[in-house]
């Protein structure tokens, strides 16, 4: 590719006076790259968008390169003013494609929401029809659960659609920025043409030709990967290519600045520099005309010296090679330039070849007459261009950083999807196990039903009345069982359908992969055939060159023989003259001598004639060989032309086949997109299935509880039957005894009456004494409570006053030390005070301290990973008044714990259940009372476990109630402190999974709060935290943090005593980073950044900075 471009470059560089060099040198770039924007408007999801991006621009290309190539095509077809119009049209096309993509995403979001609402309404009508029977309560629960699950699935779908829309918006923004960069490049190109800097344009042609060759090779292999992982990998590679292109643009900008500085055109002296370049541009044709050298070396020297004096630049070498004509000439001229010319004035005054000094001296005088409005315009345009280029680079960095963060989150979402698929399979297995257990429970229910029928028959035999609630409940349970058998059958049918769809999709995907592999094989065979044709053409060229060399040799031999023949003819003429002279002498002189001479001459003549005849034969033979070689050459030329036409036809056929393969690949991509949409629908169905499964689990637990209740009722019935039998026997014995004692009852009635009156008086006296004692004890209890509260309050007040005094003294000492030193580290006395305060805020323990540490004091000693319900800030960031309020709330919670220490046992609550026995305790044996009390205590334990949340709410609501209600509720809340300590007591599975997710990734809650990606959510949190701070503008995680002020501002919101923010400046980077890292390490945040790297790099690694900021957020906010 380089060989094909260099002649055009050399021809363009020869016309130095024409300003169209920068526009014509880009003709070597390919035109086909502009078609890569077409697949971007046809995608349907984020994965298809990524695949289209990867397919259109596989490895080392980016959006900037695309726009650069389209602009180069536009510039070849028009003059220098046309790139602006072409860039405007491309920007309009790109913005229209972006608006089309956003409209597509909005329509897709509306259709998905409408379908979800339709599903909800259909489910609501079905539930309403089914709720007309006896299952109203269970159907209401099903409806609420289904609504929650569908709302959750709709939220996930909307989150995915929002992410896709956000990615598309970011890509549209990147495209618009690329269009602006293209516009700026066109203006830069115009400025280069005006300034005479065309070397850079000459280099871009062969470099981008090589890039296209490298891009077309992995183009086919990049499309072969059809899954999401390969797409993400390709997008990461593309992002890396974007980074490389940005680095290339930076180096280009830096090199242009260096070249301007080397030429003497600094940013403050642009006017003079541009005037001097214009003077040189007007002078260079005269110098070229005045030079007397034939090789053009002087012109190459001046061009290389003006166009780029920076050592080692490729533009200088290329320009020297074009103007000089050889590598030796290039080296000599470049060395001449670097030794002789050091500034723009020297370049203007330096002689070129044989040009005289008068011409170089009259050039500045000509240029001074041309200074005017062009200098001001060039100065303003260059300043605007540099500012806009800096702004575009910053925006490009932020966009690339956000794209990388979005890619990482997409990879995380893919991993979560895989985990959910595995969990779905596990839930399917668990569903089978639960169905088996449900069948076993139904068998047990049938067995218990038979036992209840037997017990009813026994009750009917003894004529005991009973309530028919069991029949109603059993009918309801049978109805529930039938319903869940139907649900299980429907779930099994849906699973079979899903398996069939999955099998169909996998078969389709395999067929698509096979077709793709066949297409790859065909393309490889065509490429191999093409290479073979090229090798044959090369061998034919070599044979033709050999034939031409032989022909040249024969021509040289013929020319030498013709020269020899002419020499022999001249010699023959001389001999004939000599013979004529000898004949004349023969006639005049002696004949013998003459005869001898004639004989010698005759022999010489014969030899000369023989030699001439031989030479004539050789000449004829050479002419015949020459004719034969010409015929052979013409034949080979015809064969070569026929072969070239055949090769061109085969290449056109191969191109048509390749285009057909590309169309097939696009069809496969659309099929893959449809498959991905079906996969999304299947994931929605999986979410619904999971919600139904959760509801089934809840109903199964209800069924198990109902079975336990039935067992308890069975035991109650058996116990009541035994008690009734016993009462019947006792009443019969009492009746007989009453009949026997009826006669003596009248005699002793008066005695019994008098004794009863005495006992009544004794009981009244005891009752009065017990009431007085109770009042006295209640007063003592109130006095003890008030005394303890006063003592604790006084102790806390004294301790807080001492802490405030110590902190005031420490602040004064730290203020003095801060003025004298540059870095402020926390003194060890503050740490010891904080530790002592934390230890003192938890003690001293009271009599009931065995219960309260698990309730109130547990959240205080926190770790960075454990989410605490009460977010207590660290001790260094809490004021003394806040500490006093925290300690006051803790001391107010202690009397409740002291009351909880006097709770009765479980059997104290079971006394009201004795009314079921319909008799007095005096007529029953103690064993029956013991059994009944044990049974009721087990009931209260189970009820207390089920109603843990209600008891907690009652406990919190009844703090101001009477002590009797607290005593009554403490028995039920005592086991709650044990059960609520486990995470499965009062936490639903969704909240439990959310807690696990927050422990693994603390940014998930932040992303839910602010919306969007985790990177943007953390960025918004940082911006919210640093509101009101001066000299801080956080737009990314790289350049916004390079001076350390952002770290200091974020940490100053939590640790104001550690960071004197008003004294900090952006110039003292090392001090800022040192203060921030030491403040974070003082509270336990480990530093993961290197101070030297942060100080010396303009753009630190955004991932490491984001990790450190995440650690800060995790410590202070979770």
UniProtKB/Swiss-Prot annotation:
Q: Which cysteines are joined by disulfide bonds?
A: none
Quote any Pfam family the record assigns: CH
**Which SUPFAM superfamilies does UniProt cross-reference here?**
Calponin-homology domain, CH-domain
List residues of the Calponin-homology (CH) domain.
1012-1117
Q: Where in the cell does this protein reside? A: Cytoplasm, Cytoskeleton; Cytoplasm, Cytoskeleton, Spindle; Cell junction, Gap junction
Q: Where is the composition biased (Pro residues)?
A: 861-872
Key word Calcium present in the record? Answer: no
Give the domain of life.
Eukaryota
* BP GO annotations: cell division
Keywords of the record, alphabetical order, are:
Cell cycle, Cell division, Cell junction, Coiled coil, Cytoplasm, Cytoskeleton, Gap junction
**Listed Low complexity bias regions:** 343-363, 961-986
**Positions of the UniProt region annotated as Disordered:** 1-157, 198-221, 289-379, 771-790, 837-876, 920-1001
Q: Which InterPro entries match?
A: CH_dom (IPR001715), CH_dom_sf (IPR036872), F-actin_Monoox_Mical (IPR050540)
User: What are the transmembrane regions?
Assistant: none
Q: Which residues form a coiled coil?
A: 225-264, 384-438, 475-796
Q: Where is the composition biased (Acidic residues)?
A: 204-215
Q: Where is the composition biased (Basic and acidic residues)?
A: 144-153, 946-956
**Polar residues biased stretches:** 57-102, 112-123, 838-855, 930-945
Q: Which family does it belong to?
A: Belongs to the cytospin-A family.
Q: Which PANTHER family match?
A: CALPONIN HOMOLOGY DOMAIN-CONTAINING PROTEIN DDB_G0272472-RELATED, CYTOSPIN-A
- Function summary: Involved in cytokinesis and spindle organization. May play a role in actin cytoskeleton organization and microtubule stabilization and hence required for proper cell adhesion and migration.
Q: What is this protein called?
A: Cytospin-A
Gene source species: Takifugu rubripes
């Amino acid at each position: 590719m380089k060989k094909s471009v260099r002649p055009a470059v050399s021809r363009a560089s020869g016309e130095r006076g024409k300003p169209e060099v920068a526009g014509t040198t880009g003709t070597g770039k390919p035109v086909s790259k502009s078609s890569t924007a077409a697949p971007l408007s046809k995608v349907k999801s984020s994965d298809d968008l990524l695949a289209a991006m990867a397919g259109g621009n596989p490895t080392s290309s980016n959006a900037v390169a695309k726009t650069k190539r389209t602009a180069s095509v536009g510039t070849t077809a028009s003059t220098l003013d046309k790139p602006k119009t072409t860039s405007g049209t491309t920007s309009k096309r790109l913005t229209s494609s972006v608006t089309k993509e956003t409209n597509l995403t909005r329509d897709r979001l509306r259709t998905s929401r409408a379908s979800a609402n339709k599903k909800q309404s259909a489910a609501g009508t079905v539930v309403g029809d089914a709720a007309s029977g006896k299952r109203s309560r269970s159907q209401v629960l099903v409806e609420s659960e289904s609504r929650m699950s569908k709302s959750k699935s709709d939220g996930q779908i909307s989150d995915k659609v929002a992410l896709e829309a956000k990615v598309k918006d970011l890509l549209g923004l990147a495209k618009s920025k690329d269009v602006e960069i293209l516009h700026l490049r066109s203006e830069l190109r115009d400025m280069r043409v005006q300034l005479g800097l065309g070397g850079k344009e000459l280099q871009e042609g062969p470099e981008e030709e090589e890039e296209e060759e490298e891009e077309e090779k992995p183009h086919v292999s990049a499309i072969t990967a059809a899954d999401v992982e390969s797409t993400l990998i390709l997008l990461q590679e593309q992002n890396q290519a974007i980074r490389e292109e940005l680095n290339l643009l930076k180096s280009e900008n830096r090199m242009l600045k260096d070249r301007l500085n080397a030429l003497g055109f600094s940013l403050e002296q642009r006017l003079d520099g541009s005037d001097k370049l214009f003077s040189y541009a007007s002078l260079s044709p005269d110098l070229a005309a005045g030079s007397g050298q034939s090789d053009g070396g002087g012109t190459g020297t001046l061009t290389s010296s003006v166009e780029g004096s920076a050592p080692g630049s490729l533009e200088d070498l290329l320009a020297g090679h074009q103007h000089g004509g050889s590598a030796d000439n290039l080296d000599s001229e470049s060395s001449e330039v670097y030794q002789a010319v050091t500034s723009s004035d020297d370049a203007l005054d330096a002689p070129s070849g044989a040009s005289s000094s008068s011409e170089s001296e009259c050039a500045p005088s000509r240029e001074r007459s041309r200074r005017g409005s062009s200098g001001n315009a060039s100065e303003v345009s260059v300043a605007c261009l540099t500012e806009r280029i800096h702004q575009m680079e910053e925006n490009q960095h932020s966009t690339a950083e956000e794209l990388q963060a979005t890619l990482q989150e997409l990879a995380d979402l893919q991993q979560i999807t895989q985990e959910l698929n595995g969990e779905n399979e596990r839930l399917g297995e668990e569903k089978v196990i639960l169905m088996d257990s449900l069948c076993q429970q139904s068998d047990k229910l049938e067995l218990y039903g038979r036992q209840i029928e037997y017990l009813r028959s026994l009750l009917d035999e003894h004529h005991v009345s009973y309530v028919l609630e069991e029949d109603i409940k059993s009918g309801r349970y049978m109805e529930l069982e039938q319903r869940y058998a139907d649900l299980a059958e429907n779930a099994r049918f849906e699973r079979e359908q899903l398996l069939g769809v999955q099998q169909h999709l996998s078969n389709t995907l395999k067929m698509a992969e096979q077709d793709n592999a066949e297409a790859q094989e065909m393309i490889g065979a065509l490429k191999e055939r093409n290479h073979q044709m090229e090798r044959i053409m090369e061998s034919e060229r070599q044979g033709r060159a050999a034939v031409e060399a032989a022909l040249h040799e024969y021509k040289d031999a013929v020319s030498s023989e013709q020269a020899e023949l002419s020499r022999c003819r001249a010699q023959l003429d001389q001999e004939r003259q000599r013979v004529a002279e000898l004949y004349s002498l023969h006639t005049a002189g002696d004949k013998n001598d003459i005869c001898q001479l004639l004989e010698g001459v005759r022999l010489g003549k014969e030899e000369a004639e023989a030699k001439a005849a031989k030479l004539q034969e050789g000449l004829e033979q050479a002419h015949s060989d020459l004719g034969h070689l010409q015929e052979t050459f013409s034949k080979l030329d015809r064969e070569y032309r026929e072969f070239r036409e055949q090769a061109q036809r085969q290449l056109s056929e191969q191109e048509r086949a390749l285009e057909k393969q590309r169309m097939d690949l696009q069809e496969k991509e659309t099929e893959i997109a449809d498959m991905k949409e079906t996969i999304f629908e299947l994931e929605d169905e999986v979410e619904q299935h999971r919600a139904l499964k959760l509801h089934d689990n809840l109903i199964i637990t209800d069924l198990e509880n109902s079975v336990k209740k039935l067992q308890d009722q069975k035991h109650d019935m058996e116990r009541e039957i035994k008690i009734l039998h016993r009462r019947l026997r006792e009443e019969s014995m009492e009746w007989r005894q009453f009949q026997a004692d009826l006669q003596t009852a009248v005699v002793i009635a008066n005695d019994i009456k008098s004794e009863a009156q005495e006992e009544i008086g004794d009981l009244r006296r005891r009752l009065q004494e017990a009431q007085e004692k109770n009042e006295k004890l209640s007063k003592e209890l109130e006095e003890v409570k008030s005394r303890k509260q006063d003592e604790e309050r006084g102790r806390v007040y004294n301790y807080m006053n001492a802490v405030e005094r110590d902190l005031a003294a420490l602040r004064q000492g730290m203020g003095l030390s801060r003025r004298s030193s540059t870095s402020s580290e926390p003194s060890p006395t503050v740490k010891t005070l904080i530790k002592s305060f934390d230890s003192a805020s938890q003690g001293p323990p009271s009599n009931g301290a065995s219960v309260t540490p698990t309730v109130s004091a547990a959240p205080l000693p926190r770790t960075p990973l454990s989410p605490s319900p009460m977010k207590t800030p660290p001790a260094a960031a809490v004021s003394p008044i806040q500490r006093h309020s925290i300690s006051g709330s803790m001391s107010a919670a202690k009397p409740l714990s002291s009351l909880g220490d006097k709770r009765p046992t479980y059997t104290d609550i079971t006394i009201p259940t004795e009314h079921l026995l319909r008799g007095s305790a005096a007529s029953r044996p103690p064993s029956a009372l013991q059994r009944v009390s044990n049974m009721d205590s087990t009931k209260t334990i189970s009820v207390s476990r089920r109603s843990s949340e209600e008891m907690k709410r009652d406990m919190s609501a009844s703090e101001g109630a009477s002590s009797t209600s607290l005593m009554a509720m403490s028995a039920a809340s005592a086991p709650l402190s044990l059960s609520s300590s486990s995470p499965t007591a009062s936490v639903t599975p969704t909240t439990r999974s959310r807690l696990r997710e927050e422990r693994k990734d603390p940014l998930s809650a932040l992303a839910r709060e602010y919306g969007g990606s985790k990177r943007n959510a953390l960025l918004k949190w940082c911006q919210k935290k640093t509101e009101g701070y001066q000299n801080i503008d956080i737009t990314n995680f790289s350049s916004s943090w390079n001076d350390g002020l952002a770290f200091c501002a974020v940490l100053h919101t939590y640790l104001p005593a550690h960071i004197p923010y008003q004294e900090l400046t952006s110039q003292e980077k090392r001090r800022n980073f040192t203060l921030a890292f030491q403040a974070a390490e003082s509270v336990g945040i480990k530093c993961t950044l290197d101070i030297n790297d942060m100080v010396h790099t303009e753009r630190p690694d955004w991932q490491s900075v984001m990790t450190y900021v995440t650690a800060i957020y995790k410590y202070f906010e979770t």
